[in-house]
Design a protein with these regions (language model features):
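Claisen-condensing/thiolase-fold acyl-transfer catalytic domains that form or cleave C-C bonds
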Residues: 269
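ATP-dependent small-molecule kinase catalytic core of the GHMP/sugar-kinase superfamily
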Residues: 2-7, 15, 21-26, 117-266, ...
Length: 331
């Protein structure tokens, strides 16, 4: 029996660039893949005639939805899915996309299809990546990703560039325990209104990416990276402030960022619609020193704080099938 295990990372997205056909970068932006938190999923054919899913209540529903979508294209038998670790949804970590791509890849393997290395085909199968491609490409490649946005024509390939993040760097993740970011109908409504950034803002963000963020990663200049990331995140946040309330979506996170910046800690940026943020660190010791400055509770709101490593590879695949190499990376 084909038994497949897939372990994904999670992703940070530092804000969509809402360009136009003239400015480019429509739904482009930058983000990074993280080793933690992660999805760890096993899948094999069921011994019964119905699917069996072992996961939290919300994840069980999500997996069932993905399987329904996949079966519109793929003749998938009844399967058993066990989810052993989860990424929180609507927290800015790309949990839904990573789960969907993992289920799509595992379903193809269980159905004896080996073509799992094209992330856009997996996204189409799971009906994900409606706008951003960072989590999609990151699923297979990892790293820091520069998404140039939707191509001008359907025949063009989406341009997503990947660079390696210094392995010593870390990201401190902070999120309010009981809050979620904008999602669902509200998110679709916002983008259906054809939200467009001013040409000057698009140009400024692109310069920040090309002249500051990318060179600072490639040359491992951490201080430059953290300041550039803060500037980029603030500029994008101001564009979305009317919808989410301010540069940072959650009032407690806003207060926390003020405290951190007053202490000389730079780089705090919201991921996607939040409410979670990340703060870059140059090492595990630096990350721990940042964590030590973050209270477990602020203004009555409990904060979840974690330290995450960059993930410079794609999701990992393990299989008991002799046809697949154990520990294979989706790169």
């Amino acid at each position: 029996m084909m038994n497949v295990e897939i372990i994904t990372g999670s992703r940070l997205h530092f804000g969509l660039i809402c360009g136009t056909p003239q400015t480019g970068w429509r739904f482009g932006g930058v983000g990074v893949m993280l080793r933690q938190p992660s999805w760890r999923i096993t899948m094999h054919k069921s011994r019964t005639s119905v699917d069996q899913i072992s996961a939290s209540s919300e994840t069980t529903g999500r997996v069932a939805e993905f399987l329904q979508k996949i079966r519109m294209v793929l003749p998938l038998p009844a399967i058993e899915v066990s989810v052993k670790s989860e990424v929180p949804f609507h927290a800015g970590l790309g949990g839904g996309t990573q789960l969907g791509l993992a289920i799509a890849a595992a379903a193809k393997l269980v159905s004896h299809q080996r073509d799992i290395h094209n992330p856009f085909e997996l996204a189409e199968l799971a009906q994900r990546a409606e706008r951003s491609a960072i989590g999609t490409v990151g699923f297979c490649d990892g790293g820091f990703l520069i998404d140039h946005g939707l191509p001008d024509t359907l025949s063009e390939t989406r341009n997503v560039h990947r660079i390696v993040v210094p392995e010593a760097w870390r990201f401190v993740l902070v999120r309010p325990m009981s809050a979620q970011g904008l999602c669902g109908d509200r998110e679709r409504s916002f983008f259906n209104q054809r939200a467009i950034m001013a040409e000057s803002l698009v140009e400024s963000l692109v310069r920040q990416i090309q002249d500051c963020l990318v060179p600072s990663i490639q040359s491992e200049k951490f201080e430059s990276f953290s300041v550039s990331l803060e500037d980029y995140g603030d500029a994008v946040g101001r564009f979305y402030a009317a919808e989410q309330g301010d540069i940072f979506a959650h009032p407690v996170i806003r207060k926390l960022v003020v405290i951190l910046r007053a202490a000389g800690i730079h780089g705090a940026a919201q991921s996607s619609w939040g409410p979670g943020i990340s703060i870059p660190a140059s090492s595990i010791e630096h990350a721990q020193s940042i964590v030590d400055r973050i209270p477990p509770e602020l203004d009555g709101t409990q904060l979840r704080v974690d330290i995450a490593e960059p993930l410079n590879t794609g999701a990992s695949l393990h299989s008991e099938s002799p046809e697949m190499s154990d520990g294979q990376r989706l790169v």
